[in-house]
From Swiss-Prot:
Post-translational modification as stated in the protein's UniProt record: The disulfide bond which can form in the large chain dimeric partners within the hexadecamer appears to be associated with oxidative stress and protein turnover.
Keywords assigned: Calvin cycle, Carbon dioxide fixation, Chloroplast, Disulfide bond, Lyase, Magnesium, Metal-binding, Monooxygenase, Oxidoreductase, Photorespiration, Photosynthesis, Plastid
Gene coding for it: rbcL
Site note Transition state stabilizer, residues: K300
InterPro entries: RuBisCO, RuBisCo_large_chain_AS, RuBisCO_lsu_C, RuBisCO_lsu_C_sf, RuBisCO_lsu_fd_N, RuBisCO_lsu_N_sf, RuBisCO_lsuI
Main location: plastid
Catalytic reaction list: 2 (2R)-3-phosphoglycerate + 2 H(+) = D-ribulose 1,5-bisphosphate + CO2 + H2O; D-ribulose 1,5-bisphosphate + O2 = 2-phosphoglycolate + (2R)-3-phosphoglycerate + 2 H(+)
Name of this chain's protein: Ribulose bisphosphate carboxylase large chain
GO biological process, one term: reductive pentose-phosphate cycle
One Pfam family from the record: RuBisCO_large
EC main group: lyase
Active site, per annotation: K141 (proton acceptor), H260 (proton acceptor)
Length: 443
């Protein structure tokens, strides 16, 4: 069975048992009345069952309801169908004040019907010939308004300075000021020039997201013809059907696939209603993607440390034990499905590098947009500053130093022999984003 953990807030007067049963019925075989066609099938075989209910600590009107769904309710290899059933009409149910899907347990039998990520962590490292450290990226800013040629210039400066990747912003598609084909051409020129100068393999996430699946695939085909290593998709706004189609194309044609989670906070940020991001992360691993944005813990975007590390493990590891202290409700076995690299992006700069290296480890992408292009000397020096900071943190970690305790000292030591890093340290020494997270663990 597929197991689901729902956070249920019933209307006043509705007992939790009734609310849990209603969720199970409405998201499987049930409707609001008995119908004569119920007798034409075996409902006991197909109906969802609410098998356990527990109160939420610290809340008087919230319950975690566990529901089991028989596998025959779901089409093989379709995240779209899985979500249509489990989180379809039930979220508008009048008997509930709020409903949130906290976690899913996907059984190996269903996982084996999915291709998953086009390539996975190890294949990506082999393609890029980069080992032993996190990868470095940068989102090109301003996100909208640059011409294709100026956009390509910004890409080149970042890549030659030492970054592994640059990135289209999620809302860069094909606008009047920069059509997609022009952007692809100038970015390809930039990365080939940077590769020739540095001797390193470089990439730019070319956003293939489009208004139709056909147009999206056309853009991915052109990227492959240019010989670039990676394309990008906005998987929530683009949709799971489009994402799975693109992931299959990328597997068949040797392209890596970077995934942006634009629109996720509309769905996952409120603690009592919606879908938790750990579920969206699991769905992405099934649908397919080699990278996905996962929050930073230390930057400008929402993300508590324990919760973030919980779904980072769900993205990367083969087997994850149940651990409620990190928000993981079920043990998950991914069998042979490749892993996804988490991307830390949003309001981060060189002073965050020790914490990011310690939190996310080697199999991650650390992405500095403003933290690269905001350098007072320009894009290339900004890239140099980030690369020097990263190499210093990795070396210190490998020597046994404690990044959490000595992080600032490590950055200061490195800045003594890197003027680019010293300038970056001076610019961002006072920049902090210290706000309390909205989505926290139940205690």
């Amino acid at each position: 069975d597929i197991l689901a953990a729902f956070r249920v807030t019933p209307q006043p007067g509705v007992p939790p048992e009734e609310a849990g049963a209603a969720v199970a019925a409405e998201s499987s075989t049930g409707t609001w009345t008995t119908v004569w066609t119920d007798g034409l099938t075996s409902l006991d075989r197909y109906k969802g069952r609410c098998y356990h209910i527990e109160p939420v600590p610290g809340e008087t009107d919230q319950y975690i309801c566990y529901v089991a769904y028989p596998l025959d309710l779901f089409e093989e290899g379709s995240v779209t169908n899985m979500f249509t059933s489990i989180v379809g009409n039930v979220f508008g149910f009048k008997a509930l004040r709020a409903l949130r899907l906290e976690d899913l347990r996907i059984p190996p039998a269903y996982i084996k019907t999915f291709q998953g990520p086009p390539h996975g962590v190890q294949v990506e490292r082999d393609k890029l010939n980069k080992y032993g450290r996190p990868l470095l990226g940068c989102t090109i800013k301003p996100k909208l308004g640059l011409s294709a040629k100026n956009y390509g210039r910004a890409v080149y400066e970042c890549l030659r300075g030492g970054l592994d990747f640059t990135k289209d912003d999620e809302n860069v598609n094909s606008q009047p000021f920069m059509r997609w084909r022009d952007r692809f051409l100038f970015c390809a020129e930039a990365l080939y020039k940077a590769q020739a100068e540095t001797g390193e393999i470089k990439g730019h996430y070319l956003n293939a997201t489009a208004g139709t699946c056909e147009e999206m695939i056309k853009r991915a085909v052109f990227a492959r013809e240019l010989g670039v290593p990676i394309v990008m998709h906005d998987y929530l706004t683009g949709g799971f059907t489009a994402n799975t189609s693109l992931a299959h194309y990328c597997r068949d044609n040797g392209l890596l696939l970077h995934i942006h989670r634009a629109m996720h906070a509309v769905i996952d940020r409120q603690k009592n209603h919606g879908i938790h991001f750990r579920v969206l992360a699991k769905a992405l691993r099934m649908s397919g993607g080699d990278h996905i944005h996962s929050g930073t813990v230390v930057g400008k975007l929402e993300g508590e440390r324990d919760i973030t590390l919980g779904f980072v493990d769900l993205l990367r590891d083969d087997f994850i034990e149940k651990d409620r202290s990190r928000g993981i409700y079920f043990t998950q076995d991914w069998v042979s499905l490749p892993g996804v690299i988490p991307v830390a992006s949003g309001g981060i700069h060189v002073w965050h590098m020790p914490a990011l290296t310690e939190i996310f480890g080697d199999d991650s992408v650390l992405q500095f947009g403003g933290g690269t292009l905001g350098h007072p000397w320009g894009n290339a020096p900004g890239a140099v500053a980030n690369r020097v900071a990263l190499e210093a943190c990795v070396q210190a970690r490998n020597e046994g130093r404690d990044l959490a305790a000595e992080g600032n000292a490590i950055i200061r030591e490195a800045s003594k022999w890197s003027p680019e890093l010293a300038a970056a340290c001076e610019v961002w020494k006072e920049i902090k984003f210290e706000f309390k997270a909205v989505d926290t663990l139940d205690k």
